[in-house]
Amino acid sequence: VATTTQEETDRYWNAIVGHGGQESACGWCKDRWGVSWQITPMQLTRAITHPDRAAAKRAFDAMMTMRKIDIAAIEAAVARR
């Protein structure tokens, strides 16, 4: 599921996880019926395909520490030098 804001990301995530679902890594979660979903902010997609490969790696490394994606943390990782 592609999202554009943290609020939208949170809404989808909470709707799935908050109703009998399970959290997993890197934006993945599973609903109560066992269907897996990845809630992916567009900012993450742009960050991990950033033309500055070092910035893209920082974004990827930040994502690997997350369950639900935190857009501000991804953007901070890209901005770090």
Where are these regions (language model features)?
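Short cationic/low-complexity microdomains
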Residues: 47-56
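Acidic/histidine-enriched, glycine/proline-rich intrinsically disordered or flexible terminal extensions
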Residues: 55-81
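Vicinal oxygen chelate
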Residues: 1-43, 50, 65-68, 78-80
